[in-house]
């Protein structure tokens, strides 16, 4: 489903002032309650919008996972500017995440799940890599018409996302972030 994939040529919008205002990284990752001992996976890490501040919040590794090598190269450049050495770069799709079972305490996945071809399979993969007691934070576009973002027919409504998570063995809490939403979820 390449028609849904983010175009790396538009990577500059991922670090824009508008995005910083709508999705302030520190406020958003605050929902993950990151501890310095947490190992984190940022799925669909892009150029590091969340991976970099998360790496600054933990003494352990942040696995920056992205299917697009160009995005990982940009992320590495951004992390090098911040002199971060605790980011591991993983080129992988999300229906078979190239991380070990039970390898992370937290998972961040921002504005990506609407792109995956099989949501249930991806949620199963996330469950596989999460340690017992770990949690995930999902950020997605609400299924409303907006000037930017993916087409309405690609978006997943917050209620549908919560139901899908519950069906896949997670407890889910929806947090409205107009025009986005967050879902904090833990494995049941």
Where are these regions (language model features)?
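Conserved SAM-binding loop and adjacent beta-strand
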Residues: 10-28
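Class I SAM-dependent methyltransferase SAM/SAH-binding core
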Residues: 41, 47-96
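A short acidic, Gly/Pro-enriched loop at the edge of an enzyme's catalytic core
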Residues: 95-106
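A short SAM/SAH-binding and catalytic strip from SAM-dependent methyltransferases
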Residues: 105-118
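A short glycine-rich, Lys/Arg-flanked "PGG" loop and its adjoining helix->strand segment in the class I
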Residues: 120-132
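Conserved beta-strand signature within the Rossmann-like core of class I S-adenosyl-L-methionine
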Residues: 133-140
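Conserved Class I S-adenosyl-L-methionine
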Residues: 150-168
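Core SAM-dependent methyltransferase catalytic element
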Residues: 170, 174-188
């Amino acid at each position: 489903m390449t028609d849904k994939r983010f175009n790396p040529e538009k990577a500059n919008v991922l670090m824009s002032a508008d995005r910083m205002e709508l999705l302030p990284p520190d406020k958003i990752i605050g929902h993950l309650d990151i501890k310095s001992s947490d190992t984190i996976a940022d799925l669909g890490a892009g150029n590091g919008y969340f991976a970099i501040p998360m790496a600054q919040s933990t003494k352990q590794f942040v696995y920056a996972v992205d299917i697009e090598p160009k995005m990982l190269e940009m992320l590495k450049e951004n992390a090098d500017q911040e002199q971060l050495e605790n980011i591991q770069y993983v080129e992988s799709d999300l229906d078979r995440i190239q991380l070990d079972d039970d390898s992370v305490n937290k998972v961040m996945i921002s504005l990506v799940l609407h792109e995956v071809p099989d949501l249930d399979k991806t949620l199963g993969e996330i469950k596989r890599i999460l340690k017992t007691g770990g949690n995930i934070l999902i950020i997605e576009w609400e299924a409303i018409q907006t000037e930017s973002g993916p087409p309405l027919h690609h978006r997943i409504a917050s209620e549908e996302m919560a139901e899908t998570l519950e069906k896949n063995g997670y407890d889910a809490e929806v947090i409205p972030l107009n025009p986005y939403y967050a879902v904090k979820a833990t494995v049941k």
